[in-house]
């Protein structure tokens, strides 16, 4: 489907965005609200159920592995099965996963619930929802708005996550009402299931325009034809970054603050509310910066300093300083997310977008699936700072490699700007 018409003077009214695009923004906010509070309480809940650090890491790894398996399947089948039906099925699985966590104390049942691929271990998502929505969004606005749309998508997601993180403090209210131990967390998982149902309702109201137009000809391997080399390189590099990120997902960072400094769920709720607000506000600068220096340069320039700050967090001698360094890191660390999505959608053909989103997100999820169990092991042997040091170092290496690999590969709109500038310069010569 062609993108909707671009309206230059209606940025904040969302008149430039199709109704389907607006619905996807709504589902994003609903999910990230749930992810936001789950990121704060998930590891604490599992600890209350009697799981040790290694078992907690296994459940989180199971969640990421389930997301990867779903991504592998749906990145191949979503365009043929139907994008709307795909996300509807995932919404049902989200509801079932939430109920599984709410109703059981059994480790193996929890692991099975995690394998639905819809239990998030951070306020962000890399599963099938993201794969389909990332492919659909460029169809809901003009190319000139693509990067801003992804920035808005991620900004609203961060604000949803912030609200969810703050909402996690409600466990204190549940405790005052007589719920104790694991029971004071269970209502949040019931709410998680309800949010899955709300997503289902919205997804069923999407129009046929979200579907990929049928393309004549032989079906290509994994949905990729012209861009195989590009997608392969992106997948390897994104996987490298995600492995490092998986060592310090928000669930584990919240657990680290709890272990290292003894912070309560109520305090953690405020910290991660602030963290998500800071990350959300940072997205406002992505569009102007990317327009000025380019998508790839924006990815690297904002990501690199945040990784240095990440390595400083465990070195802080006081809790307040560790929190301050973590928040300062988030002021730039997420700015590469919308630029990464926009860039990967721009450098492939339109009929490759779902497959590209699925393959790169699957690579990220598989790579990150190995990380939480390693962090859980490190926490179990009191090596609390190691995940931060390893994550920061690997991410710095990723920044250098992605710049070296793709510095000469420009999205179409950047090529047009370069050509326009060269034309003006040529016309100005005597």
Q: Where does each model-flagged region fall?
A:
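Transmembrane alpha-helix termini and helix-breaking/packing motifs in multi-pass membrane transporters
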Residues: 43-44, 48, 162-183, 259-260, ...
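Juxtamembrane intracellular "pre-TM" segments in multi-pass secondary transporters
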Residues: 2-18, 208-242, 259, 421-422, ...
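C-terminal membrane-cytosol helix-exit motif in multi-pass small-molecule transporters
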Residues: 168, 172, 193-213, 398-406
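Central cavity-lining transmembrane alpha-helices of secondary-active solute carriers
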Residues: 58-76, 273-285
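Helix-to-loop junctions at the C-terminal end of transmembrane segments
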Residues: 70-82, 172, 282-295, 379
